[in-house]
């Protein structure tokens, strides 16, 4: 009888120990499963009155309207700044532009400084959480290596570093001198004649396919409807 009781107790201890090991593993697996992919679409120089779902009558925005219909539509929301660079710095850091260190538009010339590297971006936070991270599109938060996307938490980057480009030549045409501005992973690339938003779609699709077995974050700041 004593041996049976001892064996029963031993089995109970083993089962408890096994459960103690399995439950945290299951909780971790569940947490892993709950990490959603994140696609952050950021349009350029577009106001709320430039979308049908907010009352616009002089243009057609079916895809944006579909996103609004299937998601959440804010009726009271304010951008942190009315111009490009500070609003992007605020979005990336969750801070007021002044606290993020970029309260004005960064220079669109190579060597122009922008948001300080010490600022912590959402890309850095998501990367630390195990996400594959990509910037695809417009940057405009600094045109020096230590302030460009790969130094701000992005594993992969494709796009233009300055404020705007022509969609086909990918040249910057604003107050001169005209200059080419298209980069992939910190290296200048040429896709003359190809429509930039289409290139963005192709780059995002390839990144998603490459990282289909892990959580990913794509910051997709399209350069439209901004000039030119």
PLM region spans:
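Formylglycine-dependent sulfatase
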Residues: 2, 11, 16, 20-22, ...
């Amino acid at each position: 009888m004593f041996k049976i009781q001892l064996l029963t107790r031993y089995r109970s201890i083993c089962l408890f120990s096994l459960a103690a090991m399995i439950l945290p593993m299951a909780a971790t697996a569940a947490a892993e499963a709950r990490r959603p992919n994140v696609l952050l679409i950021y349009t350029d120089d577009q106001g709320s009155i430039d979308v049908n779902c907010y009352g616009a009558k002089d243009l057609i925005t079916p895809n944006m309207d579909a996103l609004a219909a299937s998601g959440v539509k804010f009726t009271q929301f304010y951008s942190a700044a009315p111009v490009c660079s500070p609003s992007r710095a605020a979005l990336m850091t969750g801070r007021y532009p002044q606290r993020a260190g970029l309260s004005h538009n960064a220079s669109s010339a190579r060597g122009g400084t922008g948001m300080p590297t010490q600022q912590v971006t959402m890309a850095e936070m998501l990367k630390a959480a195990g996400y594959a991270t990509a910037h695809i599109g417009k940057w405009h938060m600094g045109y020096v290596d230590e302030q460009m996307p790969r130094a701000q938490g992005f594993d992969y980057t494709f796009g233009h570093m300055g404020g705007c480009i022509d969609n086909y030549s990918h040249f910057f045409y604003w107050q001169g001198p005209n200059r080419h501005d298209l980069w992939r992973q910190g290296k200048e690339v040429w896709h003359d004649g190809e429509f930039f938003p289409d290139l963005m779609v192709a780059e995002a699709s390839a990144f998603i396919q490459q990282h289909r077995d892990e959580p990913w974050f794509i910051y997709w700041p399209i350069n439209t409807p901004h000039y030119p």
